[in-house]
Amino acid sequence: AKMTAGRIVQKLCDDYVVNLSADTIEDCVEAGKELFSEYKPRDWDDDKDASQLDICQMSFTDVLKNALEGLNEAQNKLRINKLTGEEDLMFQVPGLELEYNGRPDFSGQIELKTTWASVANTKSGKRSSSIPTQPTWSHLCQVAGYWAMKRKPQAIVYANENNFRVFTEENCEKLSAEALQNIWNHMVTKCRIRENLLKSADTIQDLLGLVEPDFSHMWAWDIHPDALNEAKKLWRFV
C-alpha cells in the first residue's frame, strides 16, 4: 500500500505542476481518492496491507501538500524554469555491456520520496514516519545514476504528513559532484560484477549457485508465501 500511495502522490504532483491537468489541490485530492479506490490490498498478510491502505488514505492529502511545497523549493534551489515529469533514461556506460536504465521523477534532477506512517500495535493503530536527516544510500545511488547521464545538480525531496525536507549539494555534501562521482563509480563496479556473473553462468541454476540470497532481509523478500517458498526451493533452502 505504501508503494502505491507514493506513486499516487507523484502522479498528483505531475497533474498539478507538470501537466497542469488539475486546477486546484482539491481536484488532486478527489483524483487521489479515485486512484486509492482501485487498489486491491494483498490477501496473505492478515489484513496488514488493508490496514496500511487505510492509514495512507487518511494522510495522503497532507503528504501531497508537503510534497508540492518540497518540489517548489527544490525547483527554486536548482533554478529549474519549468518542471517536466518522469522520464525513462537508457544510456551506455563505458566498461559495461548492458545499458543503464533509470527513471528520474522530475526534470532529470529531482527525486521525490514519500514516507508513511506504519501499522503498529498502539492505541492509534499506527507508528508515525520520520524524514531522514540525511539521504539514504539507496536514494543517493538513484540520483547518482541520473547525475552520471545529465551531469546536472540533483535534489532529493522527502515528504510525510507532517513536513518535508529538501536535500541539495548546498546542505548535503553527499550530493556534490565529487561525491556523486564516487557513488557512481561504486555502482558501475557492482554492475560490472553482475554482468560477469551473468556471463559465467550457462543456466539459471548455475547463476543461483553464484549468488547468496538473504532471506532475512527486511523487505526484499516481502512477497507472497508461495513465491517465497518457490525461491527457497530454487536455492535448495527447503
Q: Where are the regions that the model predicts?
A:
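A structural signal for short, well-ordered beta-strand segments and their strand-loop junctions
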Residues: 84, 108-112, 154-158
